Amino acid sequence: MPGTIPLIGEKFPEMEVVTQHGKIKLPDYFKGKYWVLFSHPADFTPVCTTEFVAFAKRYEDFKKLNTELIGLSVDSNFSHIKWIEWIKEKLGVEIPFPIMADPRGTVASKLGMLHAASSTHTVRAVFVIDPNGIIRAIIYYPLDNGRNIDEILRLVKAIQITDKYGRATPANWPNNELIGDSVIVPPAGTVKEAEERLKKYKCFDWWFCYEEGVVPKEEVEEVRKWLERAAKLQK
């Protein structure tokens, strides 16, 4: 039976996994870094191939965010090796990050990545883990629909903004329809705090205040470039 999905805010479970880069102990292998774990249904499949190419082409963008990547499927290590060799030979793209081999589905089951109706295919999932090994985000995608890698980049950046500045990011940040690239101030816990925030920040009301200029402009523009790239690719 598939395992229970770990919850956001919980510690990523300790495990030793096999990859084409050798054995890796998680989460210690990425200690001090953010990392994105993404599972895919199977090697040598069209949608998964497009995703791996997209992740590889954006790998340097992730590294700029102090973020590493690691894939996972219930394929064997040999299958992973042959698949990434095929991608390099046929598509001219080298896959620089490790891919977990989980042919028995042990890891996938532990992380809740096996569909209830199938024990032979991992679902298309994304886990974002912070430098302390805490799961910060979990996203699932349909079998037939590939992930938007630039949106995953944006999500990682948004999580880092929360960690660094103690602020929340609005919908479509940094291009929010109401407050642009500003960030949201956490709601006040007392009447006094609410009154003070109305004086200190721009507010629509006491419970909805925001702060301008928190994130450096160059960082904002970098995120906008990712989103513009994604929009151009969709045309």
Curated annotation (Swiss-Prot):
Active site, UniProt feature: C48 (cysteine sulfenic acid (-soh) intermediate)
InterPro entries (UniProt xref): AhpC/TSA, Peroxiredoxin, Peroxiredoxin_AhpC-typ, Peroxiredoxin_C, Peroxiredoxin_TDXH, PRX_1cys, Thioredoxin-like_sf, Thioredoxin_domain
Pfam families: 1-cysPrx_C, AhpC-TSA
Keywords: Antioxidant, Cytoplasm, Disulfide bond, Oxidoreductase, Peroxidase, Redox-active center
Residues annotated for substrate binding in this entry: R124
Job of this protein: Thiol-specific peroxidase that catalyzes the reduction of hydrogen peroxide and organic hydroperoxides to water and alcohols, respectively. Plays a role in cell protection against oxidative stress by detoxifying peroxides.
Family label: Belongs to the peroxiredoxin family. Prx6 subfamily.
Protein name as catalogued: Peroxiredoxin
Source organism of the structure: Staphylothermus marinus (strain ATCC 43588 / DSM 3639 / JCM 9404 / F1)
